[in-house]
Every structure is written in C-alpha cells, then in structure tokens.
Amino acid sequence: MQNLFRLLPPVDAVLTALGDDVGLAALPRAMLRDAVTAYLDGLRDDIRAGRLTEPAQLDHGLVFAQCARQVAAATRPHFRRVINATGVVVHTNLGRSLLAPEAAAAAADACLRYSNLEFDLATGERGSRYSHVVDILRTLTGAEDALVVNNNAAAVMIVLETLAKGREVIVSRGQLVEIGGSFRIPEVMAKSGAVLREVGATNRTHLRDYENAVSPETAALLKVHTSNYRIVGFTKEVSLAELAELGARLGLPVIEDLGSGNLTDFAACGLPGEPTVQQAVAEGADVVTFSGDKVLGGPQAGIIVGKAKYIAAIRKNPLNRAMRIDKMTLAALEATLRLYRDPERARAVIPTLAMITASPEALAKKARKLAGLLRKALAGRYAVSAIPGASRVGGGAYPERDLPTTLVALRPLTGAPSPDALRQRLLAADPPLVARTQDDALLLDPRTLADDELKLVATVLAQACQPETA
C-alpha cells in the first residue's frame, strides 16, 4: 500500500500537466489547486479502502486524464443548459417555458442597462413597476385591472390574505389540489389566514352546496381549475358562470385560480376543454390568478386580473412588496404579452406555443432528419427508426391529452450500451441530454428540440456511445 501512495504525483506536477488544457488553465489558480488536491485525496482514500490495488491504475498519464475530467466537472457551473428530448413542452423540472427571442432580449437589456422600472417618464417622478404590464393585461383579458407577483402560489396567497383573512372561503372538495413540490391549496389557504370551508364530495359538487355553506363568516367563493388531473365518471361540477351569479347575488367575490393560465384556444390542435383567462373574466370571475411561465410561455410570474376594487386592495397589501417581481421578469413578461396582440405571430415565435401547435407533418420531417444524422453518428451501434408516438404539454395542463408526434427510437445492437445505460450517460454529457426509455429503446421527441439542436444531439449521442475509459 505504501508503494502505491508513493506513485501518486505531487499537486504541482498535476497542475503543470493540466496547464495544457485551455479551459482549465483559464481557471483561478487557487480554485484549480483546491480541485486537484481534492482529487488526489480521493485517490488516497481509494488506496486505503482497497479500491486501487495495482500500480497501473496510478499511471501518471491516466491520473492526469482522470483528474482533468473531474476538475472540469467540479468547476463547471451548476446551473446549466439541458437538451430536452422528452417531448414534454412545459417541463417543470427543466425550466418550464422557453422565452421568445424578444422576451429574452428584453430581459437581457433590463439587466445590462438602467430602465424606467419605477420612473414615470411623463412626469419625471416616481412611477409604478406594474404600469408596464397593466394596460396590456387589461386589453388581452378584458379585466378592469391587473397585478403581477412572483408566482401563482403567491398570487393565490395574497388574494386570499387580502380578501378573506380570518374568514371563510368556500371551495369544492374536489378542487383541493396539490400544485407541485408537495404544496397543496389547503396549506396555501392556511398560510394566507383564510379559513377553508369545504363543500360537496370529491366527485360531485352542486350549486346548492355553496349556497347552503354561506354564513356571516363567508368572505369569498373559490374555484380552483384542476388542470393537472381529471375526475371522470359520475361527476358534477359547478360552472364558473353559475358560481359568479351566486356570488353577485350574495355580494361575495368569486375567485378563480386557473393555475397554468391560458390566453390561447388550442381547440384547433385537438386540445379543447381548457378555459382561457378571457373566458374566466367574461363569465364573471371577480379575481383570476394564473401563471406566466407555463402555457402562456413567459417568465415565472403570478398574474392577477379582475375587478378594479379588488385589485386595488390587493395592490395595497404589504405582502405585495415581499412578492413583487424583478425588472428582468417584468421586461420579459411585457415582451411576451405584447406578442399576444398578434395571435398568429405569438403562435409562431413564442416557443411554448410553437411546440404545442407544431403539425404532425413538421414533426415527422424533423424526426426523419434527426434519424439520418444519428445513423451516421452512431456507426451501426444502434438501430435507428422513426416511430409514431405522443408528446405532452406538461406544466399541469391537459393531463389527459396527448399530442401526436414522431419519435426517433434507438435500439442497441451487439455491444452497445443498453437504453437505460445510454440514458445515464447522456445525463452526464456536456450539455446533458434528457430523453425517455420505453420498450427497450431510447426515445427522442423532436417536438422539444430546436432545429439548431439536431446536429448537437447527434454529436452528444456519438460521444456518449464511446467506450468508457478508466
């Protein structure tokens, strides 16, 4: 064992060897030294544990190469670009919606330069940051007023805290959803100070259930759109229009949490059934909350639209300061909303909308192109084919609806890594590629791949299929 320890190169020798790597040589010397020291300490631990037993395992050329890979991995940014080949458009774990070029440029400009964030250029006095998006939200949704906070859970919380703190909010038992990250509507309500008053059964709720539950303690009626699951079979749900009529008759505000938030009617794509924000406002909701970074295709934000008197009260809530959005988000959101003034252009240039509405013919063409690139790149190690498949919208929207697509399937030939092994290698690639496996094949969905990513996908796969070195 002592002889093995003597074979380890000194730190300075490794640093000299790594100096030939342009990428590593650009790192701060102290950072590089710390990373090399950590690597050599790991080798010492492996010797003590009996995991390294042969002198050949400590050949200096091998050690230098392994160290270079480990140092590169240890010093690269943790927050990284990922290639999404899953076909899930609004992938909540991979960053949700991609921004349109105009929105990304607006956010970058807001970062790099001063702006009129809270400055009224007409008067030269202090202004409101919300003024940049209020008018366009009014125009797009038909609402009297609007406010934006940092996400939809915050939007729901500040609405309830403002309108119902210490009082009851009536909601159907079948709408007490979990919104992700183990956060549930009842818990959000409890934090807001509102008192939950459940009515109806999980599968059936009638208008009379709401009306019978109203008391002097009632502050509001809440409808939560169950966008991330469906109850089917023997069911009954009160429509928003019915609830709005009841609220108006009893003098109670009606709040609708739309969750994903949709400004586009996707019926032409075979995705009917999701209410739009415009419909919710038209049907009489007093306050509507929804997300900015899901089906809407913008940055993370919680958007609140509705009657002016309620929005004014919410705007004055001190929580608004804690939940306010930053200048980059505002810039990106305004740019995204401005694109919606021309619905056809919005569908073409907002990536989320473009991916959802992509035609089966266009996807089949893209799949054939990708398959051709992969046949060349993988040199017979995998059988590559284009097969029918399904994509998902994601982001808690359209849980029962698949989008028809053409998948590229990779099935291993003799000696090639299995689909599961290849998938793991792709996660360690640079950039990482996320795909699915099914029926003994690795599946790539072109729906969530940009045209300029196809060659990169082929390159990443070719590198991932190389024999692993020690």
Swiss-Prot record:
Swiss-Prot/TrEMBL keywords: Cytoplasm, Protein biosynthesis, Pyridoxal phosphate, Selenium, Transferase
GO BP, sorted A to Z: conversion of seryl-tRNAsec to selenocys-tRNAsec; selenocysteine incorporation
Positions of post-translational N6-(pyridoxal phosphate)lysine modification: K294
Reactions that this protein is recorded to catalyse: L-seryl-tRNA(Sec) + selenophosphate + H(+) = L-selenocysteinyl-tRNA(Sec) + phosphate
Annotated localization: Cytoplasm
Cofactor section: pyridoxal 5'-phosphate
Record Pfam families: Se-cys_synth_N (PF12390), SelA (PF03841)
One MF annotation (Gene Ontology) recorded for this entry: L-seryl-tRNA(Sec) selenium transferase activity
EC numbers, comma separated: 2.9.1.1
Enzymatic class: transferase
Domain of life of the native organism: Bacteria
Entries under InterPro entries matching the protein: PyrdxlP-dep_Trfase, PyrdxlP-dep_Trfase_major, SelA-like, SelA_trans, SelA_trans_N_dom
SUPFAM superfamilies per UniProt: PLP-dependent transferases
A cellular component annotation (GO) from this entry: cytoplasm
Pathway the protein contributes to: Aminoacyl-tRNA biosynthesis; selenocysteinyl-tRNA(Sec) biosynthesis; selenocysteinyl-tRNA(Sec) from L-seryl-tRNA(Sec) (bacterial route): step 1/1
Purpose: Converts seryl-tRNA(Sec) to selenocysteinyl-tRNA(Sec) required for selenoprotein biosynthesis.
Family: Belongs to the SelA family.
Protein's name in the database: L-seryl-tRNA(Sec) selenium transferase
